[in-house]
């Protein structure tokens, strides 16, 4: 089964909790605080594995949760950092934020990595909060929650050359003739329902990867006939080989087929219409093929490179392979995907973690309670040990320093009003 798109949920590990502890040793009457920090939570990392070809593994497991860091211990011993969760993906995997569709990473090279969900920082032990005014603090910090994100994985095959055309024009037969690939071949439409790759060697020793893509139909650029899934794999190819049934054996007009497929390539975007293209006039062993080819050449002109072949009888196959190899040599230094990504503002390196901003919003619930939300305040809430009075007082000071108290007053909050943050409720006190 070929799986080229899947949506999964990632949860990075929470940081381990810091601990409140004191140094208690004989002959050391005032040992002071000795609580260690918690360990860092595991991040979720994607890594390219050249041995993989599909996203099949993610079809059966859609949720991945990384481990949390170990808690701190006494004697200022810090908790162990959790081992990162590394998920292997095939070359050509694009990772997007499922909600915003922002491209987080484009993984194309063996061993390339991207941190997509960052593990939480370990909570600080009480020894970290010691000051001259408070030399023995009796509170510590919980670990920071790990990031949680839903992402879409898209696989775009890494092939040098893509075979495109209507169903049953002979693409699979051509691939089977020029490589050792064994695609499914049949006398009916859409025999090929998944992309097939084959390594092709020319008689003069050059080689390239050829992809046989499922047949396109009119409206493919708008998703008709799974067109989006199929056209996605053309994006990374350097050369497009447009296969046409020049005999018209299916009752179609070769010229109309040519125009329709090129229109779909242009409509899809990604500048596919600008890729170097070779037109393969296939099925030249059948009746009417020669006459149709002459009419076709008259209509498209001399600027279109046309190679007449018969994949069935293997006529002119070597000439086609030489033409493809020459075209690849001509465009070997051109990175079409880079140009497309720059036009779209895509970062192809990796996802960079952006720290939370100290912004917040205040809304009202139906029961008139004030609801404070925002990444920074919610992060502080999760990292506060509300079983410790000193920790609660520290949280209140943090709210004041962020300007939340003043903002609540401006919204009309009075003494005794209820304030909610995540699952917690507080009384507003003047």
UniProtKB/Swiss-Prot annotation:
| SUPFAM superfamilies assigned to the protein according to its UniProt record, in alphabetical order | Obg GTP-binding protein C-terminal domain, Obg GTP-binding protein N-terminal domain, P-loop containing nucleoside triphosphate hydrolases
Write out the residues that bind GTP.
165-172, 190-194, 212-215, 282-285, 310-312
The answer to whether the entry has keyword Metal-binding is yes
The disulfide bonds in this chain are: none
Residues noted as binding Mg(2+) in the record, renumbered to the chain:
172, 192
List every stretch annotated Disordered: 118-144
- The enzyme class is hydrolase
> Biological process GO annotation list?
ribosome biogenesis
Q: MF terms per GO, please?
A: GTP binding; GTPase activity; magnesium ion binding
InterPro entries recorded: G_OBG, GTP-bd, GTP-bd_Obg/CgtA, GTP-bd_prot_GTP1/OBG_C_sf, GTP1-OBG_CS, GTP1_OBG_dom, GTP1_OBG_dom_sf, OBG_GTPase
Family assignment from sequence similarity: Belongs to the TRAFAC class OBG-HflX-like GTPase superfamily. OBG GTPase family.
HAMAP family noted in UniProt:
GTPase_Obg
* Protein name per the record: GTPase Obg
Look up and give the organism this protein is from. Staphylococcus carnosus (strain TM300)
- Gene symbol of the encoding locus: obg
